[in-house]
Amino acid sequence: MARVTVQDAVEKIGNRFDLVLVAARRARQMQSGGKDPLVPEENDKTTVIALREIEEGLITNQILDVRERQEQQEQEAAELQAVTAIAEGRR
């Protein structure tokens, strides 16, 4: 198991408080959202994987925001399509 130095990750995010928020958000995505890790797992927990992703510059708060917006738009489009299909079926 590789050691993660938090200082490297803090430098990527800006401060340790935002680092905690971004790492927790990303770890939660992997744990409950079914998102795949962007770095090799190496038998690490999701929090460690999230910190390694941040350390390598693969994840930032802005990246997470953009991805969530894209997913939300895709889901809304799918819901609209389903509603349209139902409405057309009733005509």
Swiss-Prot record:
GO terms for biological process: DNA-templated transcription. It is an enzyme of class 2 (transferase). It catalyses: RNA(n) + a ribonucleoside 5'-triphosphate = RNA(n+1) + diphosphate. Gene3D superfamilies: 3.90.940.10. InterPro entries: DNA-dir_RNA_pol_omega, Pol_omega/Rpo6/RPB6, RPB6/omega-like_sf. Belongs to the RNA polymerase subunit omega family. The RNAP catalytic core consists of 2 alpha, 1 beta, 1 beta' and 1 omega subunit. When a sigma factor is associated with the core the holoenzyme is formed, which can initiate transcription. Promotes RNA polymerase assembly. Latches the N- and C-terminal regions of the beta' subunit thereby facilitating its interaction with the beta and alpha subunits. This is DNA-directed RNA polymerase subunit omega. It comes from Enterobacter sp. (strain 638). The lineage of its organism: Bacteria, Pseudomonadati, Pseudomonadota, Gammaproteobacteria, Enterobacterales.
